Amino acid sequence: MSTGPLIAEIAALVAEPARASMLSALVDGRALTAGELAYAARVTPQTASTHLARLTEAGLLSPMREGRHRYFRLVSPNVVEMLDGIVTVALENRPRRRPLSRQERELSAARICYDHLAGRLAVELTEVFTAQEYLVIADEGAEVTEAGACFFGAFGIDLSALSSARRRFCRVCLDWTERRPHLAGALGAALTKRCFDLAWTERMQHSRAVIVTASGKRGFFRTFGITVSEENWSPTGTDGKSRPSRLAAYPSE
């Protein structure tokens, strides 16, 4: 079976600027109304309706109705991977002509990618997990080691429940801002939820960006050895000392 026509069909849909804007607005996993997506794409409701119908027919969007409103969301994380892949290719080797805007810096630092963390914070977490041999990464796949199972369990993540889920348990995505992998799959989503539950992170209003709270800054350093600052995040503390060699401190509710 030739995949060329399939690629061409999806590429043509995504290539239209309004449809691309609608898809981008849904990358954080939320469901938005047709009106909200029309606003995001800067088109009239009538034009938005036509675009949404085409994206739904192509299997990229899943519609749902709540009362008087009709909501749309991306049909699966695979659509997010496709969009992030396009961005990665578009940015690769492109010379930077201007400094990053504040919004771009916020997204680069930490953001939501469908249902899991992305950006510099997510990449550093993944590097900690591999350095401590909690994860073994090969290509786009990842496997939790015995030590990792103990760690994630102590951190408050039920791995047995994740393993029985219908989605892929553990994998990695290439982060389009950092050009390094970050944790995804059911485990990546559970880790993200745990950080929100601990109030270490908060969603930024009207943005995919994620804010690290004051307790989160303490927690990420104590548990993972990651220093979160306004300027940058580095694998060393502000005093220049290296991160802890063992992640022995676990959070409490």
Go through each PLM region and give its residues.
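Amphipathic alpha-helical dimerization/coiled-coil segments
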Residues: 1-5, 28, 80-137, 155-206, ...
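N-terminal helix-turn-helix DNA-binding core of bacterial DNA-binding proteins
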Residues: 6-44, 70-72, 112-113
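Short helix-coil-helix linker/hinge
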Residues: 13-19, 76-77, 107, 119
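Canonical helix-turn-helix DNA-binding module
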Residues: 34-61
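Beta-hairpin "wing" of winged helix-turn-helix
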Residues: 56-66, 70-73, 138-139, 204-205
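Basic, amphipathic "hinge/linker" alpha-helix immediately C-terminal to the N-terminal HTH DNA-binding motif
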Residues: 64-89, 144, 148-151, 216
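A contiguous pocket-lining binding segment that forms or flanks enzyme active sites
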Residues: 133, 137-149
